[in-house]
């Protein structure tokens, strides 16, 4: 999905602007092999609420942070893809008559915007399959459509221009995830094409659960809770104990570009295994609250999807996002859910620089994939 108003090149800078930190990567997509190649990656911490639920609230602050980070990372690529996600997005699955492209486009817009009070929206769609009408036996398209307000797209376009970048395309994270996980092997052992999986993005303020059935996301749910409070409580505990005064190996590997962030407690030093929290009641309480929200959301989403879409039972869960770095989070979540849980470490379709941590750059990788 590429929204109009943006325009083209081969190697791209891609920015994931959906969370409290910007994720940036430079790379290419080879359509023949289906592989993504990343040359440089980095994370740009932002001041609190500079981007709120995917919407820019402090354009100047983001521009300054982005320009500083790109200079420090020695990224000179100008052609830029940005991928976003927020409550402003509206996505629907539709079944529409198999008509000509222009007619289908009008039908999709009517279905998406017909009941909306905001008609100033950009609407894009993909055809995900075909079916037959039960009554007429006529052919119908299965369509997934997404609408984003024009002013959101305009804000990001102006942001890129303010950072001396050239807008190329705009994507949305669910679409980026769809493209990235359409095929390939996860962690060297799970074939996406013949598995039913849960992908769980653990962000600071949100949690996104995607049910992936044989390479297609049948359902995506984004919840308004994240690991921010758990991180803050852990930092307070560590600082009380006199820790947190040196840059972590993870911060170096991720190329975090802000000196303030380099002194923060890295998540890989925060152990969330239940036995490790016995002597830290405040951290234990924060972890219990977070895992309760997480397990309840995962269980409800999985059960709803199995009942509604009649898919196979879910075989594995894979964690990505900033929260996937917590020590033993996969082990603890597996214990509570009673199913296999792994952190996303590798994908056969993605190659990155040395010590590349794919779990932080999933949306960037998917957004690099351009479909014509």
Label every PLM stretch briefly.
Residues 2-44, 80-85, 186-223, 227-229, ...:
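Gly/Thr-rich phosphate-binding beta-strand-loop-beta motif of the actin/hexokinase/Hsp70
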Residues 40-71, 279, 283-286, 290, ...:
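N-terminal phosphate-binding loop and adjacent alpha-helix
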Residues 63-73, 184-195, 300-302:
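Phosphate-interacting basic helix/loop segments used at nucleotide- and nucleic-acid interfaces
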Residues 79, 83-185, 348-350:
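Active-site neighborhood for divalent-cation/phosphate handling
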Residues 82-86, 317-324, 344:
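Glycine-rich beta-strand-to-loop/alpha-helix junction loops that act as flexible
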Residues 176-179, 184, 324, 342-372:
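Glycine-rich phosphate-binding/hydrolytic loop that grips phosphoryl groups
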Residues 236-241, 245, 249-314:
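Adenine-nucleotide phosphate-binding core of ATP-dependent small-molecule kinases
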Residues 313-339:
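Glycine-rich phosphate-binding loops at beta-strand->alpha-helix junctions
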